[in-house]
């Protein structure tokens, strides 16, 4: 007779992200973002791209994994960010998920040490404060182009916030001794506190200010 699973395998009582941080007490205050921030308990935030071909499938990807995926981005290539073209500057983690995984884990440890809070909760606050509610789009009428203010969908708000958090970390550690993990931790903490030093928070304010002037 086969032994039960609890005797054959080690099954933890509570699944924690990176084996350290629980998501049970993590709250999302923004009602529009709440359905799109996946916080199901898991040890390893890696979905193996199962949702890649499903419409809106990325809404089911764990929020920490989505941050890891943004950390792997190559940086701005066709425009300057922070006054620099940063493409290939972070080649050591471009498309290398395990390295990005370790970077985010180290950043979370720094956040926990500095804030004495659950770093996942701090990340959620940073996302809520960095997600623009309004943006502008270009429309053509009578051969003339106009800028018009539009509402931003919740999924795009989440995408923009994560992208700017990762990009802000890249700017902070551009050609200096600050490691990417340290820069990422500083960016997340600053965005969570609505600090103007945060690139993501400042970018959100800029986007909404331009949209307001285009009404």
From Swiss-Prot:
Record GO terms (molecular function): rRNA binding; structural constituent of ribosome
Q: A single GO CC term, please?
A: small ribosomal subunit
Q: Name one GO biological process term.
A: translation
**What InterPro entries does this protein's entry cite?**
Ribosomal_uS7, Ribosomal_uS7_arc, Ribosomal_uS7_dom, Ribosomal_uS7_dom_sf, Ribosomal_uS7_euk/arc
Signal peptide position in this chain?
Answer: none
Keyword rRNA-binding among record annotations:
yes
Give the multimer and partner information: Part of the 30S ribosomal subunit.
The UniProt function text for this chain reads: One of the primary rRNA binding proteins, it binds directly to 16S rRNA where it nucleates assembly of the head domain of the 30S subunit. Is located at the subunit interface close to the decoding center.
Kindly give the NCBIfam families that the UniProt entry links to this protein.
Answer: PRK04027.1, uS7_euk_arch
Family label: Belongs to the universal ribosomal protein uS7 family.
Task: List the protein's name.
Answer: Small ribosomal subunit protein uS7
Organism (species): Thermococcus gammatolerans (strain DSM 15229 / JCM 11827 / EJ3)
């Amino acid at each position: 007779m086969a032994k039960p699973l609890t005797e054959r395998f080690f099954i933890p009582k509570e699944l924690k992200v990176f084996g350290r941080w629980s998501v049970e007490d993590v709250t999302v205050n923004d009602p529009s973002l709440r359905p799109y921030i996946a916080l199901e308990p898991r040890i390893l935030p890696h979905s193996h791209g199962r949702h890649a071909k499903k419409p809106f499938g990325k809404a089911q990807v764990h929020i920490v994994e989505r941050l890891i995926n943004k950390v792997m981005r190559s940086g701005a290539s066709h425009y300057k960010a922070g006054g620099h073209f940063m493409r290939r500057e972070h080649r050591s983690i471009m498309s290398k998920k395990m390295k990005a995984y370790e970077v985010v884990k180290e950043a979370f440890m720094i956040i926990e040490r500095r804030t004495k809070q659950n770093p996942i909760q701090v990340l959620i606050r940073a996302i809520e404060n960095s997600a623009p509610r309004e943006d502008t789009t270009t429309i053509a009428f009578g051969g003339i182009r106009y800028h018009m203010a539009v509402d931003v969908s919740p999924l795009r708000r989440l995408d923009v916030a994560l992208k700017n958090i990762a990009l802000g970390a890249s700017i902070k550690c551009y050609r200096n001794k600050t490691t990417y993990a340290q820069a990422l931790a500083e960016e997340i903490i600053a965005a969570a506190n609505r600090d103007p030093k945060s690139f993501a928070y400042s970018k959100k304010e800029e986007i909404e200010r331009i949209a307001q002037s285009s009404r």
